[in-house]
């Protein structure tokens, strides 16, 4: 393991200071928390920039990891995962430097897609669900469609844009 880390660190040093090497250990699940700490501390000794101890199971483990690992720590928060769902502000106050609600948006999007498609399958229409949906204008604003289309006009040849939009103006504002 240390040889691979040294190779990653050499690559980081060759690339420049904006490249971060994060060490991840999943050892808790296999060999336990103490071994995960040992592995993380060994990686820090070699020179990694950040550590991610996957699946911390209690706030006590979180605190202990923060106390014993002398590097910035990442915490991922996954609904239904092993790590307690602590508010981001609490995780920051504890000392975590990189906090990732890794699947929250994906889980919410999947639930929303499932619910609306189930409604359409059962009733044939999304009516009655519209208050949970973006309007096209809201969607265009959130995904910054006007900016995307401005970049298209700047970087894509006019002929290709005409083919893409069948000679019509973009569809912003629908």
Place the predicted regions along the sequence by residue.
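Alpha/beta enzyme core
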Residues: 1-101, 107, 114, 118, ...
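Active-site pocket-lining/capping segments in soluble small-molecule metabolic enzymes
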Residues: 101-152
């Amino acid at each position: 393991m240390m040889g691979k880390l040294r190779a990653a660190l050499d690559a980081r040093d060759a690339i420049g200071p904006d490249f971060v090497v994060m060490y991840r250990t999943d050892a808790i699940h296999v060999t336990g928390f103490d071994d995960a700490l040992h592995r993380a501390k060994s990686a820090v000794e070699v020179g990694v920039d950040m550590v991610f101890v996957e699946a911390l199971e209690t706030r006590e483990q979180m605190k202990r990891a923060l106390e014993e690992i002398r590097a910035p720590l990442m915490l991922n928060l996954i609904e239904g995962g092993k790590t307690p769902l602590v508010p981001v502000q609490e995780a920051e106050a504890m000392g975590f430097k990189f906090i990732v609600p890794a699947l929250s948006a994906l889980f919410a999007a999947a639930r929303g897609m499932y619910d609306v498609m189930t409604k359409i399958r059962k009733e044939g229409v999304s009516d009655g669900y519209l208050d949970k949906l973006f309007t096209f204008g809201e969607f265009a604003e959130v995904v910054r469609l006007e900016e995307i289309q401005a970049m298209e006009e700047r970087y894509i040849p006019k002929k290709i844009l005409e083919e893409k939009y069948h000679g019509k103006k973009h569809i912003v504002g629908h």
